[in-house]
């Protein structure tokens, strides 16, 4: 049989002697590896799996386009004007903001995202195929073997859900049907098979179920908290170093959070609520919470502020050079660092002062997001244009996190799917307490809840690429900041590009 070759970004994991999280992810080399030999060793599986995570962190996927820029531009979140001569990577966001899909720049964005998503899926398929062929026996420990396979299924599901949310039809009461490939191919020579919405969702659910089964009794998160698994050196509590830093991997609770996200997107709010509550209440065998909501401990430290809420991440990507991608795009230097930061609207994504005011309209002034998340940066004419500090790290920092699934989302899903106002108010009070807001006014109707939820998604997940999907699943007609342009069902369906890869 003809051997298939694939170029993988293979990260060589130091099985012993980790000195930092960057050691875990950053010792990497581009090599072309014979796929028939790669999975003959545990190190081969490690490299292939870590290569998947490395690909997700690229700027063409979650490093920028799927989080900070393009997908949030589709939600019309960034303040942009047609009269400004933007740099190309900002201009493309203007076209997305006004939903002009006919522009070459827009089409290039869609092709880039689409191809990179399916390329990342193909790499997960290579790992899954290796297990189907019995190569998993090269991983001696049965639990580690199950975790690696479970992560591959979880990643494949994660990617396919985002393909569906971006390029698929609206999930509820669709009048326009879209078929999409659910990729299980392991070579670029193979043709992708297209599926109807229902067929696609069935495969997505099957992958999530498989990931859950493999991870449930084998993932170290059953025994330890995320914080304990992030300990380094002699403090590591597991024998296999590859099983540490579970917040940066598709762990069991990340898969459950993904499942809750999926069911909420599909309109099954009750099931989404129930799963989200399981994640919220998750504990180790010792009864310790696996993860808790981020608080002032993340946002308000005098040093090493971490605005991207890493402590509450259920799944995130580690990005060693986050400053190099976030600062040129977002600026976002906190006033606590310098009051002289300058923004250039041709180069940076910003808000206007009125938009920022509206974003936090009616919010308690103690809300740590309004206090720490945004910086009132000025342009060369001293005009203020707020920039987001979520991804700010110092230029010399070696730490950076891109959140992909957070506990805050589980709270908002649980609130939206709750059956009583009492439960809604209890959950929302806990959620807001983590933002240093003590509530005195409570929701009196479910309509009030829905109105507030759209505002909360916007405040909480700005620059994380989630707002467009919230609008899409609700088929929202008028987007915040872009009410002059009415959305319709067709505008929520991103045109499928001409090429798969």
Predicted regions and their residues:
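Membrane-proximal, proline-rich intrinsically disordered regions
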Residues: 21-78, 276, 319, 465, ...
